[in-house]
Amino acid sequence: ACLNPGDEVIIPEPFYANYNGFACAAGVTVVPITSRIETGFALPPISDFEKVITKRTKAIIICSPNNPTGYLYSREEMEALKKICIKHNLYLFSDEAYREFCYDGEYVSAMHLDGLDQHVVLMDTISKRYSACGARLGALVTKNKAVYDAAMKFAQARLSPPGLAQIMGEAAVDLPASYF
């Protein structure tokens, strides 16, 4: 529903190495743009994004806080991403698996960016938040009905996560805020 073979996705680097493998398996080209250590790995300038956007560009992937750098995108950076996604009709795939690991600054979810509802696909997992690495239990969250419908078709064709992971996941989401 979001990407087809031959499409491109922009990712600020350094990035989670598996994004490259996932894209390759789908026939999608990763177009990296470099974030710099001198800026603490802040979001590269929007002009860098503009330079690499083509008619094949369909999405931007971010991870905030970033894996592997730990950089937390600011509200201003998230708003800049919103503007470019709307301007070019791009999806914003937001990996928010590390959202509990914010030590400085305000965590801003892509789902909370007004006007971006139809462009955001949030990816999350219990493995980081609840120290359940290996459980492979997560979520894809979107308000875009076409994306949701496509995900549900895929979900119907896929086997479920292991029973123990499901039981553990259900118990984990009921933990009190004091857990964190």
Regions found by a protein language model. Name each.
Residues 25-31:
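A short helix-loop-beta submotif of the ANL/AMP-binding
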Residues 7, 28, 87-91, 116-118:
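A short helix->loop->beta-strand "cap" motif at the edges of active sites that frequently abuts
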Residues 21-23, 84:
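Hydrophobic/aromatic ligand-binding patch that stacks against planar heteroaromatic rings
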Residues 13, 32-37:
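Short beta->alpha connector loops at strand-helix junctions that form conserved
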Residues 119-180:
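PLP-dependent aminotransferase class I/II
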Residues 35-104:
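Active-site phosphate-binding strand-loop segment of PLP-dependent enzymes
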Residues 1-8:
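Phosphate-binding glycine-rich loop
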